[in-house]
Amino acid sequence: MNVLDNSVIIKGSKNGITVFLDEEMPFEELLENVSDKFKNASKFFNNATMAISFDGRNLSAEEEKRILNVISDVSELNIVCVLDENNDIKSVYEEAVKKAMNSFNISHQPERQKITDPKTTCMFYKGTLRSGQVFEADGSVVVLGDVNPGGKVVAKGSVIVLGSLKGNIFAGVDGNENAFVVALEMSPMQIKIGDIIARSSDSGVNKISKGKNKSKILEPKIAYVYDQNIYVEDLEQNALDDISLD
């Protein structure tokens, strides 16, 4: 691809990257340019996990899929989701990050922490919770990072992980089965909501199970209690409509 070629432009944003695509270039030629652009930028992205959005060109579902596959093939970029201007998740993500960056409640504690202020409705934890680290809160929790195997979040409210969930989450610890758990990548060792427990080794379609799909395109998911079982679904509007905040 010519160094002066502007058919594919990658720009960073608060939530990930936006790829601007030439509107008139034949798609097959554009696809080659996407491959070249991301191949050249692969060292810059390294193993970064982020959302992606496309601008400048209307893509069919098949074209978008082919572009994502090319990006996955030529780079180590982990794409958690594809955002567009009408995407509700984008608004939620932006608002969570904005509040977290301006909040005095951002925490970097590597040791066991307990938040005891009864007025606290939501706490933010910025960083990765590693094995042996525990974050506790009297309200809900938003983790701006990953929860690694052996890491744990304990909350009286709900838990949202804006990253990979591979550790343990105890939500609604005071018996609140209306609490829920959301993660951009849902692969937990254990989730407990209220008094209901699900482990990664549990069988049954409604229980949590580690997926065998190794695709780098991750789907945000939500875990909630229904009929004394923990269900995990894609984070879509119909799933959100079933959530009670009482």
Swiss-Prot record:
Keywords: Cell cycle, Cell division, Septation. Belongs to the MinC family. This is Probable septum site-determining protein MinC. One of its GO terms (biological process) is cell morphogenesis. InterPro entries: CAP/MinC_C, MinC, MinC_C_sf, MinC_N_1, Septum_form_inhib_MinC_C. Interacts with MinD and FtsZ. Cell division inhibitor that blocks the formation of polar Z ring septums. Rapidly oscillates between the poles of the cell to destabilize FtsZ filaments that have formed before they mature into polar Z rings. Prevents FtsZ polymerization. PANTHER family: SEPTUM SITE-DETERMINING PROTEIN MINC.
